[in-house]
């Protein structure tokens, strides 16, 4: 796969619970299963593209915690180059996902953690990385101003851009 993909996005640790139904306010419900896995739209896109053989760089922010270690392990295993700022004063993102067994409907609570602190200045610090890309991708899990900054840098350099408006 020729070219290089640069992705601006966040990592979250997905914590997924399956239950027959959603609990009511104030109720504790016994679930059927639990799984923890790497998540975050940008991180997932980077991992998927790298597994398909692409040269991928991910620009993101993490806390300094166990979820950050999961992120780095995931990216290393997939072959993703990480351009990441670690914040000692913030947590890595996490998502609570509840899946109802019968309907397979889900409800998600997302805490973007350190990913919510990505600024245009953080993105501008990676301008040289973005300008070397064939494709620049981003989503809207990190702040809109950061995504806009990345898109502007990429377009000015003639890099093809992709905006996934998720999680909208």
Predicted feature residues:
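Short beta-strand scaffold segments in enzyme catalytic cores
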Residues: 47, 94-98, 107
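Residues at secondary-structure transition points
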Residues: 29-44, 66, 87-91, 113, ...
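Short beta->alpha junction loops/turns
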Residues: 61-64, 143
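Glycine-rich phosphate/adenosyl-contacting loop at the front of the ribokinase-like
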Residues: 1-61, 68-70, 76
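Thr-Gly-centered strand-to-loop micro-motif
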Residues: 31-32, 39, 61, 94, ...
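Ribokinase/PfkB-type carbohydrate-kinase core domain
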Residues: 1-11, 57, 72-87, 99-168
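Short, basic and Ser/Thr-rich N-terminal targeting/leader segments
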Residues: 52, 78, 90-93
């Amino acid at each position: 796969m020729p070219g290089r993909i640069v992705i601006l996005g966040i990592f979250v640790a997905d914590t997924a619970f399956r239950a027959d139904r959603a609990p009511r306010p104030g109720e504790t419900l016994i679930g059927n299963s639990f799984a923890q896995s790497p998540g975050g739209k940008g991180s997932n896109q980077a991992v998927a593209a790298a597994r398909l053989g692409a040269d991928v760089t991910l620009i993101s922010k993490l806390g300094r915690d166990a979820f950050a270690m999961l992120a780095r392990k995931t990216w290393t295993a997939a072959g993703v180059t990480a351009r990441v700022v670690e914040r000692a004063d913030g947590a890595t993102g996490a998502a609570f996902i509840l899946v109802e067994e019968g309907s397979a409907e889900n409800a998600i609570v997302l805490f973007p953690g350190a990913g919510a602190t990505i600024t245009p200045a953080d993105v501008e610090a990676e301008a040289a990385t973005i300008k070397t890309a064939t494709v620049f991708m981003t989503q809207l899990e990190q702040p809109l101003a950061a995504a806009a900054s990345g898109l502007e840098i990429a377009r000015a350099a003639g890099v093809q851009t992709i905006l996934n408006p998720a999680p909208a």
